[in-house]
From Swiss-Prot:
Protein name: Small ribosomal subunit protein bS20
Family: Belongs to the bacterial ribosomal protein bS20 family.
Any Pfam family hit: Ribosomal_S20p
Region (Disordered), start-end ranges: 1-25
Organism: Exiguobacterium sp. (strain ATCC BAA-1283 / AT1b)
Length: 86
């Protein structure tokens, strides 16, 4: 445990950010998995609606630095290709 006051504050802040970041990443992964599940079912309309939400989550995670912007683009491209193949 930190002894210096500023280090204690930084530890608290880091823990809060770690929890928030992990929640944001989990929501992003869930949105992507939902699109994949709908594609496997063959439900194109629902998959397109879920794709909009997944795109939003991926872009937000990339802008916050949770994932690299290229990974966000790659994931969006792959999801779009799967939907287009339906």
């Amino acid at each position: 445990m930190a002894n210096i006051k500023s280090a204690i504050k930084r530890a608290k802040t880091s823990e809060k950010r770690r929890v928030a970041n992990s929640q944001e990443k989990a929501a992003m992964r869930t949105a992507v998995k939902r699109v994949d599940a709908l594609v496997l079912e063959g439900n194109k309309e629902a998959a397109q609606e879920a794709f909009v939400l997944a795109t939003k989550k991926l872009d937000k995670a990339a802008s916050k630095g949770l994932i690299h912007k290229n990974k966000a683009g790659r994931d969006k491209s792959r999801l779009a290709a799967r939907i287009a193949a339906l």
